[in-house]
Amino acid sequence: MGIFKAYDIRGIYGQDLTEADFYKIARAYAQFAGVQGGRVVVARDCRKSSDSLFESFAKGLVDEGVTVLDIGLGSTPMSYFANGSLKADGSVMITASHNTKEWNGCKLCKANAVPISGATGIKDIEKLVAGMTGSEPPNGQGRIEKVDVSAAYGEHVRKFAHLARPVHVAMDFANGMGIAESVAFKGQDLLTHDDLYGEYDGDFPNHDANPLHVETLKDLQALIRANPGKYAFGVAYDGDADRAGFVDEKGDVIPMDFTTALIAQDLLKSNPGAVCFYDLRSTKMAEETIAASGGRPMMSRVGHSFIKEQMRQNDAIFAGELSGHYYFKANFTAESSSMATYALANIVSASDKPLSELVEPLKKYSQSGEINTKTVTPPAEILAKIKALYADKARVFELDGVSVDAWESEGYWANVRMSNTEPLVRLNLEGKTKEIMEAKRDEFLAIIRA
């Protein structure tokens, strides 16, 4: 099956994955993670296939002697919170995240919300599933226990609020699991919000729940622009609410690495000297802002499982990824889009400037954006060529792909990575000036496309 991905299990329901597959995956997960006889949190999103897939997954866990802690409809951050706060042995989130309605899947964790990725277990689970018929006798007799964590989760997230004045926010839930996150804003008088698409609908009828694609933000932008001065900013959640995109009070998109810098700035006020991670595609201003705010900036490779591992190893309080994942030590070193929302609200409430003016200094340098190139030459050969060409001209390192750091000598940095799933090479580059960026961008693209 091609459903076993780098970070989760995902496919088109009824075509790539079925209830029978989910039953086997559940049993394989229980065996691999060693949770037989233990307690596992299971949450699900609002897709039309999620209920029946939950029933099959729960049956598989029960047949491995697992007590299933069924938290019902919930966001991925809520499932992480339940895993950690209930001291469970693992958690499962049934979701296909931002994928369209035809898809479904699951995200698997061990205890303390430690993710199981392709590199740390998904491939092992795939092998176990391949050896199953689905008619194996039970290895135990577990049970299903319904647990409601929504109120506790809301209280947990609200601890992040330290607003100096009222802040009014526009929220686009895209008919997805951001709706479950709204519990985090109940009982907080200083943060109020107006909502778009706040009814669960697994068909996602209004737009895809993917804030990484700017076109999905159009309705949120239109709401803000139709009401000048009403909203401090807007937030759009993805399908399972572990990612968020933000727009300012004018409806203009805030780049996600800028959001990383702003959130770190807020957190470091109460955590001086703490480590904050930014992913290696981020603007240099993320690193500089963290340092200027009294923090210790550290660069991470791309991918949530890698980032979480690096955060734990370095006792980091926060990490931000260019994809819109924002990770908090306070949420068991996992994502919380609502904590990110509170962090921005905290910043706005403490300033006499609107968010657009707080973002402006972060535009100091010139970024290429991510440029993807389909190549005939094997991507590994291209990366090796870049490493050889620049080894004597700059600091070259291989945290994720090949990075070339000539910031001090020539005023630019570049990162060239392979796609995990396609024959693509991805280039991200930033220059101290637009002229430097464009010249170096063209130089690197000429090598990649040769």
Residue ranges, per PLM feature:
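An N-terminal, well-structured beta->alpha segment
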Residues: M1-K59, D63-G65, R143-V169
